[in-house]
Amino acid sequence: SSSSSSSSWGDSQGTASVSGSNPGLATQQTQAMSSLDFEDYLRAIAQKTFEDAKLSTAQAPLRSQSLTAAQIAQVMRAFTFEDTRIAFAIFAHDRCVDPGNYYKTYDALEFELSIEEIEEAIGQ
């Protein structure tokens, strides 16, 4: 019964606040994005032509929603360039519901050095 499924992933859960300090953020991060919303989210990223547009599209909903490590890896595969994959992996780490499984994102990378760069940035 989702009448607006085409853009529901981009909604900010009814909150009008767009400031960086969202008190509801911590509670929203305990549950990952639903698989239906995730499909819409991946489709929206894939529709973008340019890498920077893909990255900003990927980052936008994560201001109020979270992903699993496996979902983050899927998003990383949507990018053409390794640098973008690294940037997204670093950005998404704080929005991961299962950070203990973050190693799963490393399969989406081409180079061993990329893993080191991410681990250094996220403090592992």
PLM region descriptions:
Residues 1-124:
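General marker for long, soluble alpha-helical cores
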